[in-house]
Amino acid sequence: MLNTYFKIGDFICHVDRYDRETGLWGYSCDEIPVLNGWACEKFIEINKICS
């Protein structure tokens, strides 16, 4: 689950922490244009956001 990437609006987010007390995963988001070539190359195999 850690380092799983997903998209929220125009933000690319990744799961980066786990809270053992609550059992919840935490994530951070970076504002990266979805059609940006670098972002596509980096994330396309993970979650197919550039289809």
State each model region's role.
Residues 2-51:
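Acidic, low-complexity, intrinsically disordered interaction modules
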